[in-house]
C-alpha cells in the first residue's frame, strides 16, 4: 500500500513538473511587453500652432492617458493634417491604411465618407458628424464600421442669433457666411428668429477659398453690422483667416467655434468634452468593441467663449452680465 502511495506521489510530482514546464512559455508571453496598437487621428485643417492650445487634442490625449493609453508607450498615434484639402485627406487615409492602423479618428461626416469608401473593416470614429443618421443608418446601433459624436449645428444657429443680439443690441443686419453644408431646411426658421429679434439676415456663399475676400467686401457694401459663420466642414481649415477678415471689416463675429482663432465669440459643443468622449470610443474599440456596439452620441455640454482681445480691437464694451455667462474669456 505504501508503495502504491509513493508511486502516486511520484507520478503527481512528475505531472506537476511537466505542467509547470508547459505553462512557463505562456507566463513568459504574458509578461512580455504587449501589443502596442497604432491608431490615426486625422484633421482636415492645418496643424495647430505650438503657442495656441488645442482643447480637443489636449482632452483626447488626457482621456487616453486616464484609460491607460500613453502615447509612445502603450499606444502609437499617427497625426495627420490635410491642410484644407479633401484630396489630400483621401491620400492620407490611403497611406494610413497601408501603414497599417487599427482605427481612424476623423473630424466630420464628410471625411468619414471618404474613409468609409477606402475601408469597410477598420473602425472609424467621427469627432463631430452632421447627418450621422444618413451615414450610419441607425444612431442606436451603427451599421458597418463607423460611429462617433453627432452635431447639433443647424439648431445652434438660432442660439447664435440670440447671443449676437444680447451682446450687441444695436445689431440689425447680420451677414451669414455659408459654405457647402445644407441649411435650406432651417433657413426660414433662422429668418423668422432674426426678424423676431429685430434683425435681417444677409446671405453670403463661399465655396472656394479664393472667394473669402470678395465675400467680405460684399458684406461691407451691404452695410452688415455683424457676422455669423455657419457650422460647415468647408470652414474648418480657415478660422484664423475668417477672423482676420472680420476684424479688418469691423464685423463682430460668432460661430460654433473660432473664438480661439479671433472670432468675437463662439458657442458650441465643448471641445474638451468631445476630446474626452472620443478617447472613450477609442478605448472601447481597442478593448474589443465594434462600432455597432457603440451608439452615436449627441453633444451634452456646450460652451460660450468670448474673445476680449477681439472685443477691444473692435472697440466694443460687453456688459458684465453677458460676460458673466461665458464659460471662457480669452484675454
Where are these regions (language model features)?
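Short hydrophobic alpha-helices and adjacent helix-cap/hinge residues
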Residues: 1-331
